[in-house]
Amino acid sequence: IAAGGPPPPGLDDEEKRAFEHVSFFYKHGLGYAQEMGNRPQTLYALEDSPIGLAAWIVDHDIWTYKQIARVFDGAEEGLTKDDIVDNITLYWLTKTGVSSSRLYWENKNAFFAPKGVNIPVVVSAFPEEICPIPRKWAERAYPKLIYYQKHPEGAHFAAWEQPQAIVDDLRDGFRSLR
């Protein structure tokens, strides 16, 4: 995908759509992840300026921008302006704008290649996620997948936009382990 190659043979329609979505993200929306993965110290400015932090959060990739922009366009579903300000405030007051990028630095060589996950896994799939995960992909990536739920709406901020769906999936998914 990162090299811009064609989809592998044998993908079903859902997998083709997911592949196209991920390919688009790799070509047009991965800049912020590359910055955090390769040069995280350049982001220390986020600790110095609440406006800089807000700009980074609001406009650091295409899908984030889409999710946030619809708030300011008057969309009634999803996030609110207060949600956005609350999130920026949480990052600012806890000084986690930079430390949150450590995930990218520490996983820069294997971010999209989960290996060795030998614990029970629950997957909540949302249609507008940056990297959609068809059930077949989840099953291949996580041999101990115990629950998979595909939702009709939600995106990269699903836990923020659809918190009850996440709670329900976690409860339903891990109930069998009690």
PLM features per residue range, with description:
Residues I1-A45:
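A catalytic-pocket lid/entrance helix-loop region that shapes and gates access to the active site
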